[in-house]
């Protein structure tokens, strides 16, 4: 089976695998042959019922799993560990009938589930009949128009993607009134994110859009290129962060500036996580096109090399495990040996794949001096950090503080009690904090709104 590539995961894989939710996009090796397949909705129904039943370990013994899913299970304490990771949702009350769909070009099955604390769809992603990933999504049996927010309106607006002869669907959220309004473009973190940056029960970009619109600021968010065109991009060996993130953010700024109710002189760019890391590159790309944003907001952005960040995340998540088996330690050692190759990216052939991304992706990042470029930025910049973030930590925040301490155009704020998604949680929860039903903290929205309105 052909390997499936890379830029559609990276940090997302680090996050999701430790909740028992394997990212689909990393290389997937051929599964064992003498095992059952998930090929139809009734298979998915049975698989989920076993997972949530008394003997989830049967899934490892009887059903096909890709190597990546096996790794996720190993690092989660087996399928029982995966089932336990869903405990934050409460006890299972109802399992609905599965229906078939597609995620990133992979066959997927959506199973509506009602738990005592929340209702979600469990999404089972398959590759040639083998289970390749498990994640959560919005509950599809939820009543429409439930708790609709007020005080703004939404308009569908797509970002053109000429090199793929397509577009990225998006939503422009507008305050009430005629405008022209200040506006902000939201730029996703790593992984194949939708316009809401949905992760488990959280939708931080939707929260930001609605919260800022209520403060008189328009917000433009769009589905990420790897979310819409993941199947086309998996074999693009030459793809870099420019293709994955930067060029589309620039196009979004340009299309937003053309909207009648938007003030083109007051457009800001907000990047989260890897999107925040990309902000200096976005600023330079806008300058190269003889345009500019009015200012920039970076949320949970790391100034450190991505490989180093991945290593730290794995170390931390392993530390949360009550016991590390020999097999789990061997898996970790193998991953770290792979990450060690990033210390000499020039030695990599273009078709070498490290942690789910081809060598050109890593070579571009190795040449990207984010701290130096940030120091050279002239526009007002706001950098925000959650103090309970285990993915991008206060160590990263202190690096920014030291590098930017003499830069009058930079403002840095950290928030006690907030996670990587700026929702309430504790670092010691790890990814289980994202199973909570939370929204982006109001203080974060107020601080962003105040910065934009200055």
What is the role of each PLM region?
Residues 139-178:
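N-terminal cap/lid segment of alpha/beta-hydrolase-fold proteins
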Residues 180-189:
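Short beta-strand element of the alpha/beta-hydrolase
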Residues 189-244, 315-318, 424-434:
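Cap/lid segment of the alpha/beta-hydrolase catalytic domain
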Residues 238-260:
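Alpha/beta-hydrolase active-site loop
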Residues 255-317:
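Primarily recognizes the serine-hydrolase "nucleophile elbow" in alpha/beta-hydrolase
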Residues 285, 295-376:
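Accessory cap/linker subdomain of secreted extracellular hydrolases
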Residues 377, 383-385:
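Short beta-strand/loop motif that positions the catalytic acidic residue
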Residues 421, 427-454:
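Catalytic active-site module of serine/aspartate enzymes centered on a nucleophile-bearing elbow/loop
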């Amino acid at each position: 089976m052909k390997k499936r590539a890379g830029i559609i995961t990276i940090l997302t894989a680090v996050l999701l695998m430790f909740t028992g939710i394997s990212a689909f996009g990393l290389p997937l090796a051929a599964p064992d042959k003498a095992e059952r397949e998930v090929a139809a909705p009734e298979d998915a129904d049975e698989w989920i019922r076993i997972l949530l039943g008394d003997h989830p370990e049967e899934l490892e013994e009887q059903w096909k799993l890709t190597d990546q899913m096996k790794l996720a299970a190993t690092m989660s304490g087996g399928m029982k560990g995966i089932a336990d990771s869903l405990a934050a949702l409460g006890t299972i009350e109802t399992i609905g009938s599965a229906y078939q769909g597609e995620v990133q070009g992979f066959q997927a099955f959506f199973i509506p589930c009602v738990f005592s604390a929340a209702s979600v769809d469990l999404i089972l992603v398959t590759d040639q009949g083998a289970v390749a990933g498990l994640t959560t999504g919005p509950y599809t049996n939820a009543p429409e128009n439930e708790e609709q927010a007020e005080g703004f309106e939404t308009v569908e607006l797509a970002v053109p993607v000429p090199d793929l002869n397509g577009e990225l669907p998006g939503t422009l959220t507008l305050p009430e009134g005629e405008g022209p309004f200040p506006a902000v473009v939201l730029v996703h973190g790593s992984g194949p994110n939708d316009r809401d940056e949905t992760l488990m029960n959280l939708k931080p970009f939707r929260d930001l859009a609605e919260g800022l619109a209520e403060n008189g600021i328009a917000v433009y968010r769009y589905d990420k290129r790897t979310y819409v065109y993941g199947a086309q991009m998996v074999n693009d060996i030459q793809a870099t962060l420019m293709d994955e993130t930067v060029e589309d953010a620039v196009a979004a700024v340009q299309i937003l500036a053309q909207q009648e109710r938007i003030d083109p002189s007051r457009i800001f760019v907000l990047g989260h996580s890897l999107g925040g890391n990309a902000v200096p590159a976005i600023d330079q790309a806008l300058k190269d096109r003889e345009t500019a944003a009015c200012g920039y907001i970076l949320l949970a952005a790391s100034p450190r090399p991505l490989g180093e960040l991945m290593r730290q995340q794995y170390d931390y998540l392993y530390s949360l495990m009550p016991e590390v088996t020999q097999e789990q330690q061997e898996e970790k050692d193998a991953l770290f040996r792979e990450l060690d190759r990033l210390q000499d990216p020039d030695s990599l052939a273009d078709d070498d794949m490290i942690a789910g991304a081809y060598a050109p992706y890593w070579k571009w990042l190795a040449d990207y001096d984010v701290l130096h470029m940030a120091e050279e930025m002239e526009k007002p910049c706001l950098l925000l950090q959650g103090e309970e973030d285990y993915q991008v930590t206060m160590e990263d925040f202190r690096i920014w503080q030291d590098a930017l301490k003499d830069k009058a155009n930079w403002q840095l704020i950290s928030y006690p009690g907030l996670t990587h998604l700026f929702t309430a949680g504790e670092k010691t929860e790890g990814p289980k904090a994202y199973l909570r039903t939370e929204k982006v903290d109001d203080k974060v929205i107020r601080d962003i709104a105040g910065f934009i309105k200055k």
